[in-house]
């Protein structure tokens, strides 16, 4: 018999992406991108099903988030976030 898996452990939700973005800002990120889209402090991250909508473009997983800033502080902010 297999174990019962929670589907939410395998799906990236809008709040998951928002939590990563917020933690990176809190950690001092100076610049950030999700996929090939620049993220600003007021950028909207919207998920419809498993598709991420950013600035009118649709992206499917896996999602890539990159940031420029103080590496140690950003890692610490990600580690300290209860939402990530």
Where do the language-model regions lie?
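Core subunits and conserved enzymes of cellular information-processing
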Residues: 1-84
């Amino acid at each position: 018999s297999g174990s019962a898996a929670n589907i939410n452990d395998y799906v990236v939700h809008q709040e998951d992406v928002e939590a990563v973005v917020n933690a990176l800002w809190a950690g001092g990120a100076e610049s950030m991108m999700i996929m090939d889209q620049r993220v600003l402090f007021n950028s909207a991250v919207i998920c419809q099903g498993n598709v991420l909508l950013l600035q009118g473009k649709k992206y499917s997983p896996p999602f890539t988030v990159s940031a420029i800033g103080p590496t140690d502080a950003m890692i610490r902010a990600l580690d300290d976030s209860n939402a990530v």
